[in-house]
Each structure stands twice: as C-alpha cells, then as structure tokens.
UniProtKB/Swiss-Prot annotation:
The gene is aroK. This is Shikimate kinase. Pfam families: SKI (PF01202). Its main location: cytoplasm. Gene3D superfamilies: P-loop containing nucleotide triphosphate hydrolases (3.40.50.300). The lineage of its organism: Bacteria, Bacillati, Bacillota, Clostridia, Thermoanaerobacterales.
C-alpha cells in the first residue's frame, strides 16, 4: 500500500492535513520533522543552530530513503525536502506526492508567531517570499496540488481523497490494522 506524501512550503498545512487524512484513511501518520526531532533528541531549531542545516538535511535524506518502501503511511514532510532530487525520487518510489500550497500572505499569517522556524529570521514576510522564489517550481513534482489558502481543512482533505480515489490509490481493505507507525528500517548512511 503506497504512502501518501504531503509536500509543500512551510505553513501550507502539511501536518494538519496529514493528521486528518490519516485518521480518515485509518493509516499511521508520520511527520518527518517530528521523526527527525525524535531521532536527534532535540527540536529542529536546535539541530539547525547546533549542528547546521547540512546535518538536518542529511537526517531528512536518510529518512526519505527509509520511506522509499510503501508502508501505507500518511507523511507530512518538511518544506525543504523537495530541494534534494534524491529525496523526491525516494518519496515517489514509496508513495504518491500530494502538494499543498498557499499564497505568501496566508503563509505569513500562519507562521509569523512561531519561533520554531529556523529559516525564518529577520523580516519574516520578506523571508517567506525569498524562499518561495528560491524554490519556484520545486513543488511541481506533486501529482496533485491543493491551495490550502483557498479551501478549509475539511475541503482540502476531501479534494485529496477524491484525487486518491480517482487515481486508484485507495484500495479496498487497505486500511492500516496496526494503528501505529510501522517501524522504519535501520539503514546505514
């Protein structure tokens, strides 16, 4: 059973949509940033400060390699995961890529008070626009994209469900029986 992989810029709702989608599909939910935090024993912000973005991206790439195998998960990725073509190939090998997008102002309103975003230093509004410009086209690898600024959470999830059904990604009897996140294999770097 293929993973449903949510990609998109920070603040587009990947975690919220992923959690709700996982509940509806009765599948385990995995947030890659949370998993990296769990494995590193510290928040993403501290990883960036203490170890650097390169270390974070390395951990992210390792996790993407583990996700190359279909496990029936709903996965919310970090916003920069698509910057590494190997990550995209691994995620695509194990699942279907669903993009979430939003207008820069919508993103700003969602993230402006969050201090945990290591890439948003200084003028947050300007930094969002700068990062979106740098990543222009990077999220186009998604098979289907929903603008979460234009739709409510339930509507966004509904649109994704329709797409998954139309494309045959939802198989009869494909619901998860474990209820938890399957153990990801320990692979060497």
């Amino acid at each position: 059973m293929r993973n449903v992989i949510l990609i998109g810029f920070m603040g587009t709702g990947k975690s919220a949509v992923g959690w709700r989608l996982a509940r509806i599909l009765d599948r385990p939910f995995l947030d890659t940033d949370s998993e990296i935090e769990r494995l590193a024993g510290k928040p993403v912000r501290r990883i960036f400060i203490e170890d650097g973005e390169v270390r974070f991206r390395s951990e992210e790439a390792l996790l993407c390699r583990k996700l190359a195998v279909p496990r029936g998960l709903v996965v919310a990725t970090g916003g920069g995961v698509v910057l590494n073509p190997e990550n995209v190939a691994n995620l695509r090998a194990g699942g279907v890529l669903i993009g979430l997008s939003a207008d820069p102002e919508v993103i700003y309103q969602r993230v402006r008070r969050k201090k945990s975003r290591p890439l948003l230093r200084g003028n947050v509004r300007a930094r969002i626009r700068e990062l979106l410009e740098e990543r222009a086209g990077a999220y186009d690898v998604a098979e289907f994209t929903v603008d979460t600024g234009m739709h409510s959470l339930p509507k966004t999830v509904g649109l994704i469900m329709e797409f998954l059904k139309e494309r045959g990604y939802l198989e009869a009897g494909s619901d998860s029986e474990s209820g938890g996140v399957p153990e990801l294999p320990d692979i060497s770097r």
